[in-house]
């Protein structure tokens, strides 16, 4: 029964998954109709050198997103030092750990080493600052021409508002409808890591497969708006009374 499910709310979180193409232009579109949960992950030392203690000390905050690009400065990622400290703690604990706990600790050490290497080499989207969506693993990076790739452009529609966004990460196969904290709070100022902006299946995610820029990089907010407007025009344009949101770059120098 539903009462036995871990999360009854997400038992039914998808109204539509539609693959279509506009006949006049051939522009492919993946349309997801769902709710919106909040994802709060990501970091980028090049654009944001410091993060709050609640993030630095969090055991749950994920420092990376699937959409990433090579670091462009020598500024360290703010989460690098906490992860290095975590790795040192795991190694110290391993020295005196009973045999039954060593396997799990070695897995934690391996994971921490991979994260540290990523933080040294790459930058990522930041949920609090960048508007992006999360697509289920079973949908993204598949062989279908309608399957989105990381960095593809998307437009999120809630009511009469249209929000430009990027496909920034992949989530569980069983979960549809996730947006970054920046996107969520623009839709509903009361949204937070534990409070979704939209609970009903009234959010349209228009994803444009194959639209990602040739070279990954930090979001260019002017280009984000312009490109999403172009893509919307390729599927017939916006209806009367609808407006495309213009994001402000909160991390601009």
Give names to the regions the model predicted.
Residues 132, 166, 204-206:
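Soluble periplasmic/extracytoplasmic beta-strand elements of cell-envelope proteins
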Residues 142, 173-175, 193:
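Short beta-strands and strand-coil junctions in structured, solvent-facing domains, enriched
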Residues 163-172:
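Short beta-strand-centered aromatic/proline hotspots
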Residues 172-174, 212-213:
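Short Gly/Pro-enriched loop/turn and capping motifs at secondary-structure junctions
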Residues 242-253:
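Short, solvent-exposed mixed-charge patches
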């Amino acid at each position: 029964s539903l009462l036995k499910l871990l999360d009854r709310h997400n038992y039914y979180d998808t109204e539509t998954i539609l693959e279509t193409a506009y006949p006049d232009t051939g522009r492919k579109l993946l349309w997801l109709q769902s709710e919106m949960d909040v994802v709060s992950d990501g970091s980028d030392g090049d654009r944001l050198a410091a993060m709050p203690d609640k993030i630095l000390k969090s055991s749950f905050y994920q420092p990376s997103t699937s959409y990433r690009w090579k670091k462009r400065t020598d500024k360290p990622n703010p989460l690098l030092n906490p992860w290095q400290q975590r790795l040192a703690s795991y190694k110290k604990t391993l020295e005196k750990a009973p045999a039954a706990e060593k396997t799990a600790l070695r897995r934690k050490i391996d994971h921490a080493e991979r994260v540290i290497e990523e933080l040294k080499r790459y930058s990522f989207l930041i949920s609090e600052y960048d508007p992006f969506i999360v697509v289920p693993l079973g949908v993204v990076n598949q062989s279908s021409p309608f399957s989105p790739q990381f960095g593809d452009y998307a437009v999120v529609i809630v009511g009469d508002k249209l929000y430009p966004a990027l496909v920034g990460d992949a989530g569980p196969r069983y979960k549809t409808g996730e947006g970054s904290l920046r996107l969520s709070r623009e839709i509903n100022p009361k949204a937070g890591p534990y409070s979704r902006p939209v609970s009903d299946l009234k959010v349209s995610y228009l994803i444009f497969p194959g639209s990602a820029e040739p070279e990954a990089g930090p979001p260019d907010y002017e280009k984000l708006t312009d490109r999403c407007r172009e893509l919307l025009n390729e599927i017939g344009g916006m209806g009367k009374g609808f407006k495309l949101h213009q994001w402000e770059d909160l991390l601009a120098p």
